[in-house]
Structure formats: structure tokens, C-alpha cells
Design a protein with these regions (language model features):
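N-terminal capping/small domains of soluble enzymes
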Residues: 1-103, 109-110
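Functionally constrained cores in energy, signaling, and assembly domains
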Residues: 8, 12, 75, 134, ...
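A sequence-composition feature that detects small, non-aromatic residues
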Residues: 15-20, 119, 129, 149
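Residues at alpha-helix caps and immediate loop-helix transition turns in enzyme cores, especially N-
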Residues: 26-28, 114, 118, 142
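Glycine-enriched alpha-helix->loop->beta-strand junction motifs that scaffold or abut catalytic
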Residues: 39-43, 123-128, 154-155
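Active-site-adjacent beta->alpha loops and helix N-cap segments on the catalytic face
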Residues: 56-59, 86-96, 112-114, 136-156
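Short, electropositive alpha-helical surface patch
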Residues: 100-128
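Hydrophobic alpha-helical segments and helix pairs
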Residues: 118-144
Length: 156
């Protein structure tokens, strides 16, 4: 059992983006959720990483199989940072989540000032934690300056 500094306790966590932007699964997982084969409410879920502005990433909704491969015992993906941007999430997804039923960890990626701005935007939601995605192996970008972004808002 892991206990966060805010008191949230969890034993199992779903990896960033594995259950989409709402913690309830990608469209190809919905039938498994409906059948009870995937139960998001059993986990603390890290949502798909959000960026300040929309990014196309690698996922194409009309052919997701180009980014997702099933392997024995699971799957791997190269979705990258496909997302519609944090403002979309804050207006279209975040307000409609049941944070009591689905403990959600936010995930953000960006430059230092963007990280601070996005963290403030997500502060209006009942997230159990916030992940700063320091690097995504499918974007070709270098590691970000996460430490300086955190210190800029939390000086010692």
C-alpha cells in the first residue's frame, strides 16, 4: 500500500494513458469495461498526458492499431502525446468525472511556464496527484526542466 502526502492510499495504479483521458478506457477498451473485464474503479488511474495546446501525436482514431500492439500478457503503444489540449480536458472531460469512484492522477507535459500554468488549471479538479511527464519516448524531445518548474512555484 502506498500513501501519498495528501493521504490518498492505493495499492494498484494504471499507467499514464492506459485508460484514456477519463480513466474509463479508450474506445477499443469500452466493451471490456461494459463486460466487467476491466474495472477502472479498482485502481488509481493516471490519465493520458495533457499538453497546453492540442498535439497530433501518433494516434489516428481511424486506425489505432498502428500505435497499439497486443503482446502476450498486455500491450505496448507509441501513441506519443496525442491530445486535444488541457483547455479541452478542463471543459469537456474534467467536470464530468466521478472523482470519488475513479481516483484520478493528472498528467502534464510541457515547458516550464506551461507546466506551472497547467498545474494551476488542474487545481480546480479533485485529482489525487499530479504527474509531470518529464519525457515521452515517442516524441523525440529531450528531458524537460521539471525540477525548476516545481521550484518556481514552491520556493524553499
Amino acid at each position: 500500500m502506498i500513501t501519498l502526502s495528501n493521504g490518498h492510499k492505493f495499492e494498484y495504479m494504471v499507467a499514464s494513458g492506459a485508460l484514456a483521458f477519463d480513466g474509463k478506457g479508450w474506445f477499443w477498451e469500452k466493451p471490456l469495461v461494459w463486460l466487467g473485464l476491466i474495472k477502472p474503479e479498482l485502481f488509481t488511474v493516471v490519465i493520458k498526458t495533457l499538453t497546453r495546446y492540442p498535439r497530433p501525436g501518433n494516434l489516428r482514431w481511424w486506425k489505432p492499431w498502428t500505435c497499439v500492439r497486443l503482446i502476450p500478457g498486455g500491450s505496448v503503444n507509441k501513441i506519443g502525446l496525442t491530445n486535444r489540449g488541457i483547455e479541452w480536458w478542463c471543459h469537456e472531460v474534467g467536470p464530468y468525472l466521478d472523482y470519488e469512484k475513479y481516483p484520478i492522477v493528472g498528467s502534464i507535459y510541457g515547458e516550464e511556464k506551461e507546466l506551472v500554468e497547467m498545474a494551476k488549471m488542474l487545481n480546480y479538479f479533485n485529482l489525487v496527484a499530479l504527474e509531470i511527464n518529464d519525457s515521452c519516448p515517442n516524441t523525440g524531445h529531450e528531458f524537460q526542466k521539471t525540477e525548476s518548474a516545481i521550484k518556481s512555484e514552491n520556493p524553499k
